[in-house]
């Protein structure tokens, strides 16, 4: 049964004037980290049952209050006098849609999520020069349940920034605007080049699509061949994985090692072929000096653990975790400073991020992102945390996202996309530690 989503209201919500701490039409340059992020809107969709759902007015009131501390979200993209893209911190506001569904949320979550999740967040008009960079949709169900779907341009912020923002938004609703954060928003201060700048790595082809970029080698598939899957790993399974590793490791490291092994086996690749994972690395604590964890913007680079297929499949979990850990460790303060220096050298150049377009096939490789640090239970608007995180379609084969489970018993959800021909083989082995 298809669920009809009816848009009932559309407005532009501006920050609370009495609380605004920044903006006022100032311009802010994109950092080289922003330029490396995809110029695309990233959706996030959360659901609250009727007992925990706040009213629309409460949600909008808290949003107006918290936007006063996040001027980039309330601003617009602009072009400076040198023709470079920049932020205009003009407090122009965010788009807010309100919608209704003539069905109960529990029924929709049980039967129709995949069929209508992409109707639960706003669709940005990429051709509109004045398009809000952050957009919200509040969808109310017949039972009183609420789904909040957002879409934010990735060049504005990374996942860590948005997780801090969502928690701050919830706190603003709970406190009726009395509890507001003071995030670090000075982009110029987090990417200071040396004098003279001295990039030491080939960033034009690693983080951007230069002439010799690794992204040029990937093929594509019709979107109907790319299957989206959700795999739940209970806490007990994660604990068993860590025990299987036999050495100290993080939840992310052991789950990535497991997923890399099982997906590679399901793909039935040649033993002599190489496979690598593009791992998003938060650089805030790795930079020198360190950048505050509440910095709002992009501060992500990528690590590339790589193994021959036969070695990956025959190696112990501890060995694979070691390969992942060593690759991530190479994204150190020297590498980060080199990237910042490259940004200065290439400030006037046209740079294209290595983001994969829909239909891209990463096989034999993977790309992984982690929201495991996102405290979903802190996303409490006053009556309780969300009952579900709803994954939108992932249109890129080989992309994995780890998210903490909203289930009462905890655990981790892995949202992923695979070529349909490999799905059944993966399902048969995804919980095996052999």
Curated annotation (Swiss-Prot):
Active site: 154 (proton acceptor), 380 (proton acceptor)
Domain of life: Eukaryota
Keywords: Acyltransferase, Transferase
Keyword flag Acyltransferase: yes
Enzyme Commission number(s): 2.3.1.-
Keyword match Transferase: yes
Single GO term (MF): acyltransferase activity, transferring groups other than amino-acyl groups
Known role: Hydroxycinnamoyl transferase that catalyzes the transfer of an acyl from p-coumaryol-CoA to tryptamine, to produce coumaroyl tryptamine. Serotonin and tyramine serve as acyl acceptors in vitro. Can use caffeoyl-CoA, and to a lesser extent feruloyl-CoA, as acyl donors.
Family affiliation: Belongs to the plant acyltransferase family.
This protein's name: Tryptamine hydroxycinnamoyltransferase 2
């Amino acid at each position: 049964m298809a669920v009809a989503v009816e848009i009932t209201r559309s407005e532009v919500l501006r920050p609370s004037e009495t609380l605004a701490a920044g903006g006022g039409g100032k311009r802010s340059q994109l950092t080289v980290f922003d330029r490396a992020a995809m110029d695309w809107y990233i959706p996030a969709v959360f659901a609250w049952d009727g007992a925990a759902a706040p009213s629309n007015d409460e949600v909008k009131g808290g949003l107006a209050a918290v936007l006063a501390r996040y001027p980039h979200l309330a601003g617009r993209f602009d072009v400076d006098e040198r023709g470079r893209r920049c932020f205009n911190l003009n407090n122009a506001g965010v788009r807010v849609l309100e919608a209704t569904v003539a069905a109960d949320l529990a029924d929709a979550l049980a039967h129709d999520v995949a069929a209508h999740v992409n109707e639960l967040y706003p669709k940005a008009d990429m051709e509109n020069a004045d398009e809000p960079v952050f957009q919200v949709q509040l969808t109310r169900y017949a039972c009183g349940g609420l789904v909040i779907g957002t879409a934010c341009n990735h060049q504005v912020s990374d996942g860590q920034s948005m997780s801090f923002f969502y928690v701050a938004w919830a706190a603003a609703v709970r406190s009726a605007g009395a509890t507001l954060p003071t995030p670090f928003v000075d982009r110029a201060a987090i990417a200071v080049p040396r004098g003279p700048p001295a990039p030491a790595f080939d960033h034009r082809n690693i983080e951007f699509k230069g002439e010799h970029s690794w992204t040029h080698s990937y093929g594509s598939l019709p979107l109907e061949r790319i299957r989206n899957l959700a795999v739940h790993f209970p806490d007990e399974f994660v604990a068993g994985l860590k025990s299987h590793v036999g050495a100290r490791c993080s939840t992310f490291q052991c789950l990535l090692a497991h997923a890399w092994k099982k997906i590679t086996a399901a793909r039935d690749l040649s033993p002599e072929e190489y496979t690598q994972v593009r791992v998003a690395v938060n650089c805030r604590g790795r930079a020198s000096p360190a950048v505050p964890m509440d910095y709002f913007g992009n501060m992500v680079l990528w690590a590339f653990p790589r193994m021959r297929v036969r070695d990956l499949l025959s190696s112990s979990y501890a060995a694979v975790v070691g390969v992942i850990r060593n690759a991530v460790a190479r994204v150190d303060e020297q590498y980060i400073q080199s990237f910042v220096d490259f940004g200065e050298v290439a400030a006037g150049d046209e740079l294209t991020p290595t983001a994969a377009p829909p239909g891209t096939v990463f096989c034999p490789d993977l790309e992984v992102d982690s929201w495991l640090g996102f405290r979903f239970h802190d996303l409490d608007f006053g009556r309780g945390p969300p009952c579900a995180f709803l994954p939108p379609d992932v249109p890129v084969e080989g992309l994995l996202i780890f998210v903490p489970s909203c289930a009462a018993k905890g655990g981790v959800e892995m949202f992923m996309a695979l070529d349909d021909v490999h799905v059944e083989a993966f399902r048969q082995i995804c919980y095996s530690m052999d």
